[in-house]
């Protein structure tokens, strides 16, 4: 509840992130981008894994976070107060077509599988990152960083 009562909500929702370095990097980057909370599915790597802690560079102590067994229930509750954008390869629109000045949650899926279809279906909007070359997707932490900083960039101006 504390995470959802913040002013200027900017949430990062993580489903089944497995790599400790990725999770730590997302927390550290989230702090830099002004994320007000990180909510993780029970399938995410342990936040207290030594590699996660090192990767956060202290952000683990400053960014509110929550593990939940009811990830779908939390997303449904979040949708009552903010718009949920899911990074998804099947999205029709690029992330930079949207206004993120209202309360916003960014949903990122597992490094190799992406979001489960039922999780993606809960999002208000599916977004994608434009790609050149033959690259299909970015590293989960890199994609999360890009999207979190777009929210910050729009709100900063």
What do these predicted regions represent?
Residues 74-76, 95, 136-142:
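Short, charged, surface-exposed secondary-structure boundary motifs
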Residues 1-91:
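RNA substrate-binding interface of SAM-dependent RNA methyltransferases
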Residues 85-135:
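Active-site/ligand-binding-proximal alpha/beta "capping" segment
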Residues 31-33, 47-61, 117-157:
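Structured adenosyl-cofactor binding patch, chiefly the S-adenosyl-L-methionine
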Residues 23, 79, 116, 136-137:
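Generic alpha-helix initiation/capping and coil-helix boundary signal
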């Amino acid at each position: 509840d504390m995470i959802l009562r913040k002013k200027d909500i900017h949430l990062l929702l993580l489903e089944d992130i497995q790599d400790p370095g990725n999770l730590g990097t997302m927390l550290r980057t989230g702090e830099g981008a002004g994320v007000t909370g990180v909510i993780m599915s029970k399938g995410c790597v342990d936040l207290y894994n030594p590699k996660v802690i090192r990767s956060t560079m202290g952000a683990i102590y400053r960014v509110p976070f929550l593990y939940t067994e009811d990830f779908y229930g939390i997303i449904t509750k979040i949708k009552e107060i903010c718009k949920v954008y899911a990074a998804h390869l099947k999205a029709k629109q690029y992330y930079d077509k949207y206004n993120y000045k209202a309360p916003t949650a960014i949903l990122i899926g597992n490094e190799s599988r992406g979001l489960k279809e039922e999780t993606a279906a809960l999002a208000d909007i599916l977004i994608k990152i434009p790609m050149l070359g033959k690259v299909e997707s970015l590293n989960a932490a890199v994609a999360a960083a890009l999207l979190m900083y777009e929210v910050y960039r729009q709100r900063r101006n």
